Amino acid sequence: MKLPLSPSTEPVATEPLGMALLSSILAAWSYISENPERAALYFVSGVCIGLFLTLAALVMRISCHTDCRRGPRRRCLQDRECSDSSDSEDGSEDTASDLSVRRHRRFERTLNKNVFTSAEELERAQRLEERERIIREIWMNGQPEVPGTRSLNRYY
């Protein structure tokens, strides 16, 4: 289907880009001023969706960070079944039990690591723990023991 050609050869006047932007801004302003509740709802919904997507991306990055960094070599060394057949290609298909075992091993490795590099840091940490324990005991012993049947209001 052919469209008829326009008889005039004059170029069609186009709006300048600045005027179109100004017109769009004014239209948005009038919509917001006429419907403030709806505009607020759209804004809050957009912020919530953005936060949800950011949270999902962070969770995925944190949970997959160590699994994605591992190469097939490390996987083979941990499983003690390193073969050059299609096993290295199928290594990405982990079961839930393998993942839980790997996480448990990783947790045990972090427990066995020495966090403190010097004896001074270790001594400081022990003193800090002792101080926190003493403060906690003082706090717990300083609280009045209120029986369960009595009212919590002291001034009556």
From Swiss-Prot:
The modification Phosphothreonine is found at residue 110. GO terms for biological process: apoptotic process; autophagy; cardiac left ventricle morphogenesis; connective tissue replacement; energy reserve metabolic process; heart development; lung development; post-embryonic development. Pfam families: FAM176. Signal peptide: none annotated. The chain crosses the membrane at residues 40-60. InterPro entries: EVA1_A/B, EVA1_dom. Residues 84-96 have a biased composition (Acidic residues). Keywords: Apoptosis, Autophagy, Endoplasmic reticulum, Lysosome, Membrane, Phosphoprotein, Transmembrane, Transmembrane helix. GO terms for cellular component: endoplasmic reticulum membrane; lysosomal membrane; plasma membrane. The modification Phosphoserine is found at residue 118. It is a single-pass membrane protein. Residues 79-100 are annotated as: Disordered. It is found in: Endoplasmic reticulum membrane; Lysosome membrane. Acts as a regulator of programmed cell death, mediating both autophagy and apoptosis. Belongs to the EVA1 family. This is Protein eva-1 homolog A.
